[in-house]
C-alpha cells in the first residue's frame, strides 16, 4: 500500500485530490514506517494498544502523511515523548487517551448538566463577579470539550475545524468518529449503511477514489483537455 500511495506523487491530476495540493496539503507524501519496537514503546507510554488496522498502517505504510482529507497526523517521538503532530487547530489531550470513550448519552448528559449551571448576571452583585463566574464556567466547557474525546486519537483534519477521531478504548474501539463540533454539531460515528467504519476501510476507500482522480482527473479536466 505504501508504494501505491507514493506513486501518486507523479500523477497528472494530483492537485485535484482534496487535501493533496502542493504547498497546502499532504502531496501524497508519507512519513517512514515505525518499527515494532517504536510502536510498542508508544503504546506503553500512552497507556493504550492501537487498533490492529491502525497499528499495521504505522508499521507497514507510514507514521502519518497522505490520507483522507488533509492527511493522517504523524505519530512522532521527541523530547516531549510520543505524540501526534496535529497542527495548531487541534487540542487533543494524550493524558485522556487511556480513559473510556464516552457514549453519546454520557456526552449529552454532560452538556445538559453544564448548560444548566451557566451563570446568569442577575444572580451576581456586580458585573465583575458575574464575569469571573462566567469565565470559570467557560473554562469548564474547554475541559468538557476535551473529555468528550477521551479514549480517542485525532487522526485527520477535514478542514473548517472538522476532525476525524479513532476510538481506542471501550465498546467503540476501532470505530472512526466525525467531529462536527466546530459548527455546533456533535461527534458522530462514521458509518457505511448500518455498519461502523474502521481505519482500514476508511483508508482504502480514500486511496481507491484518490488514485482514480489523481490519474484520470475530473470530468471538467477531461473536457478542458478536449478543447
Question: Where would I find each of the regions flagged by the language model?
Answer:
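Long, compositionally biased interface segments
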Residues: 184-227
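Generic alpha-helical propensity signal that fires on short helical segments
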Residues: 64-68, 72, 171-173, 182-184, ...
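Small/flexible residues
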Residues: 11, 78, 93, 175, ...
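A surface-exposed partner-binding patch
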Residues: 1-154
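A residue-identity detector for tryptophan
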Residues: 82-84, 110, 137, 141, ...
Amino acid at each position: 500500500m505504501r508504494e501505491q500511495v507514493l506513486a501518486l506523487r507523479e500523477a497528472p491530476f494530483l492537485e485535484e485530490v482534496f487535501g493533496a495540493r502542493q504547498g497546502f496539503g499532504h502531496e501524497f507524501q508519507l512519513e517512514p514506517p515505525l518499527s515494532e519496537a517504536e510502536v510498542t514503546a508508544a503504546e506503553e507510554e500512552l497507556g493504550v494498544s492501537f487498533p490492529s488496522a491502525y497499528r499495521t498502517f504505522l508499521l507497514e505504510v507510514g507514521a502519518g502523511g497522505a490520507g483522507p482529507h488533509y492527511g493522517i497526523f504523524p505519530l512522532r517521538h521527541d523530547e516531549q515523548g510520543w505524540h501526534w503532530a496535529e497542527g495548531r487547530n487541534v487540542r487533543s489531550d494524550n493524558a485522556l487517551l487511556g480513559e473510556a470513550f464516552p457514549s453519546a448519552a454520557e456526552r449529552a448528559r454532560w452538556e445538559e448538566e453544564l448548560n444548566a449551571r451557566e451563570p446568569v448576571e442577575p444572580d451576581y452583585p456586580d458585573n465583575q463577579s458575574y464575569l469571573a463566574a462566567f469565565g470559570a464556567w467557560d473554562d469548564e466547557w474547554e475541559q468538557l470539550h476535551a473529555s468528550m474525546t477521551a479514549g480517542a486519537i485525532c487522526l485527520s483534519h477535514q478542514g473548517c475545524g472538522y476532525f476525524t477521531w479513532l476510538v481506542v478504548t471501550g465498546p467503540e474501539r476501532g470505530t472512526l468518529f466525525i467531529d462536527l463540533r466546530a459548527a455546533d454539531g456533535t461527534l458522530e460515528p462514521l458509518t457505511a449503511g448500518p455498519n461502523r467504519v474502521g481505519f482500514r476501510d476508511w483508508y482504502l476507500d480514500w486511496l481507491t477514489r484518490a488514485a482514480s482522480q489523481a490519474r484520470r482527473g475530473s470530468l471538467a479536466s477531461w473536457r478542458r483537455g478536449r478543447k
